[in-house]
Amino acid sequence: MDYLVKALAYDGKVRAYAANTTDTINEAQRRHHTWPTASAAIGRTMTATVMMGAMLKGENKLTVKIEGGGPIGAIIADGNAKGQVRGYVSNPQVHFDLNEHGKLDVRRAVGTSGTLSVVKDIGLKDHFTGQTEIVSGEIGDDFTYYLVSSEQVPSSVGVGVLVNPDNSILAAGGFIIQLLPGTEDAVIERLEKRLSTIEPISKLIEKGMTPEEILEEVLGEKPQILETVPVEFSCNCSKERFANGIISLGKAEIDDMIEQDGQAEAQCHFCNETYVFTKEELEELREEITR
């Protein structure tokens, strides 16, 4: 079962998150039929998004959009404080040979000229929006840059995905380490040293390490676990929502659907679920407009 942990370390001066998202990203791959490089891109993005969601409270939620100008197009992910995340990519069938480091070439797929934007719905009239430039296209570095530049929190983000030969997901997960005000230089140096020498996060998960063990490996000390949150691919789309969307198109548009196709199909971008509206159902929706 996928889950994430929130923790503190170094006498409360370091805030940390770690997640195993293997099943969640596997579900995204199954729904969107992504090829390996696209799976790595969407998997890294969804993993970072669900950890950023853990920084929120209650019913608050966020949307991340990455547009780097590469062949994959846009990557969109939604997350919330409950460990629920969903996501999709404009062009799921994108794959390249491994890069010079023997890893999936996410940078080539994502591109390096564009933006990472975050919109947070924290229950106020206006949403919080932050945007930074893509700095590497590798996703983890781009989230690090966003947190440092837009939210002014010194951070390190590590996210990774390993893909099986049959395109299913072997391992996926990540961590976010954040320095709180007043962190001593010695602690910062120690963390920088550890971050530069640890194995890729996806390898740690493949080895069977838990989020708690990953944080201990990254931090160099046993953290104080504050909360454990289950993580899952979750989409809140429904036939009722799409029905309301069809009603909003107006009577003439619904008449066209009935006359030309005798039915209507609506597909959710986020989960690929398809909803079919029969002629009778469309007529009922049309009736609702004229009531």
UniProtKB/Swiss-Prot annotation:
| Disulfides per UniProt | C235-C237, C268-C271
Key words of the record: Chaperone, Cytoplasm, Disulfide bond, Redox-active center, Zinc
Q: Which InterPro entries match?
A: Heat_shock_Hsp33, Heat_shock_Hsp33_C, Heat_shock_Hsp33_N
Task: Tell me where it resides.
Answer: Cytoplasm
Q: Which GO terms describe its cellular component?
A: cytoplasm
Which terms in the Gene Ontology molecular function aspect does this entry carry? protein folding chaperone; unfolded protein binding
Q: What is its main location?
A: cytoplasm
Q: Which domain of life does the protein's organism represent?
A: Bacteria
Example GO biological process = protein refolding
Query: Could you state what the record's PTM comment says about this protein?
Result: Under oxidizing conditions two disulfide bonds are formed involving the reactive cysteines. Under reducing conditions zinc is bound to the reactive cysteines and the protein is inactive.
Record family assignment: Belongs to the HSP33 family.
Q: What does this protein do?
A: Redox regulated molecular chaperone. Protects both thermally unfolding and oxidatively damaged proteins from irreversible aggregation. Plays an important role in the bacterial defense system toward oxidative stress.
- What is this protein called in UniProt? 33 kDa chaperonin
Q: Which species is listed as the source?
A: Bacillus pumilus (strain SAFR-032)
